[in-house]
Amino acid sequence: MSVRRLAEDTVQPAAFAFSKENAAWAEATIKKYPEGREQSAVIPLLMRAQEQDGWVTRAAIESVADMLGMAYIRVLEVATFYTQFQLQPVGTRAHVQVCGTTPCMLRGAEDLIKICKKKIASEPFTLNEGGTLSWEEVECQGACVNAPMVMIFKDTFEDLTPERLEEIIDRFEAGKGSEVVPGPQIDRVYSAPIGGLTTLQAPEPVEEKKSVRASKAKDEQAVSVPPSNAAKPSTATDVTNPTLKTPATARKAAAKNVKIEGETVDKSKPAKKPR
């Protein structure tokens, strides 16, 4: 991971203070966290400071640290760790982040970088003459299916061509960036296929509506079936089973009187051995 440091002292402002509106927002944000956990608001407060000034200054880091009762080094660690925080001045009207990861690169990200070099500056993190525009190459921004794409502040502009990116940069430079609709720049809806859906186009089946009278008549015609014991476990035993004529306890005594094919068993004769 590359080392991230604060900007030179020559460009650092002497002080930082939230605007009245942002100060009220910051106080409300801090109160959302439990007592003793207020330091968890460090990331949203740093992000709001960046939105206000365009980048995170040393004075902003110190101000946020004082608000949260944190050591300066702890807030500095957060600001330098996350690449979403800009640590040096960027364009006041647009900072273009060009995705250069594999999907976007295969779809033409290099051509978008050429446009940035042409329209803004030859090197990343370099302001144009008016200080209104800057650019950088970043890693994946999560819109791979709509590659290539760029992010300007919080908005993504996808399915770009070099010509379309050039038009977008011109609009931001003219102070009309809010007029550019973010998202796919072609006839695509979010991440749907180009040209529209190719599947799931059949209309949903409409369930046939039945009258209450017909449903009631059908219910009356239904034959009631008595409950079945098929699924119930058997609790019958040799003693309680009604299909057995003689209980198990009396079988030995009853065997003396059993007749086999009309003949009485003679106990005086030895029993035949089984073959």
UniProtKB/Swiss-Prot annotation:
UniProt keyword Metal-binding, yes or no: yes
Endpoints of the signal sequence: none
Upper classification of the organism: Bacteria, Pseudomonadati, Pseudomonadota, Alphaproteobacteria, Hyphomicrobiales
Protein name according to UniProt: NADH-quinone oxidoreductase subunit E 1
Region annotation (Disordered) ranges: 200-275
Family label: Belongs to the complex I 24 kDa subunit family.
Keywords: 2Fe-2S, Iron, Iron-sulfur, Metal-binding, NAD, Quinone, Translocase, Ubiquinone
UniProt keyword annotation of Translocase present: yes
Annotated function: NDH-1 shuttles electrons from NADH, via FMN and iron-sulfur (Fe-S) centers, to quinones in the respiratory chain. The immediate electron acceptor for the enzyme in this species is believed to be ubiquinone. Couples the redox reaction to proton translocation (for every two electrons transferred, four hydrogen ions are translocated across the cytoplasmic membrane), and thus conserves the redox energy in a proton gradient.
Composition-biased stretches (Basic and acidic residues): 206-221, 258-269
Disulfide bonds: none
Organism: Rhizobium meliloti (strain 1021) (Ensifer meliloti)
Binding site for [2Fe-2S] cluster: C99, C104, C140, C144
Coiled-coil boundaries: none
Cofactor remark from the record: Binds 1 [2Fe-2S] cluster.
Enzyme class of the recorded protein, top EC level: translocase
EC numbers: 7.1.1.-
Database matches in PANTHER family: NADH DEHYDROGENASE [UBIQUINONE] FLAVOPROTEIN 2, MITOCHONDRIAL, NADH DEHYDROGENASE UBIQUINONE FLAVOPROTEIN 2, MITOCHONDRIAL
Catalytic activity: a quinone + NADH + 5 H(+)(in) = a quinol + NAD(+) + 4 H(+)(out)
Pfam family, one: 2Fe-2S_thioredx
Cofactor(s) the protein requires to work: [2Fe-2S] cluster
Compositional bias (Polar residues): 231-242
Compositionally biased spans, kind Low complexity: 243-256
Molecular-function GO terms, alphabetical: 2 iron, 2 sulfur cluster binding; metal ion binding; NADH dehydrogenase activity; quinone binding
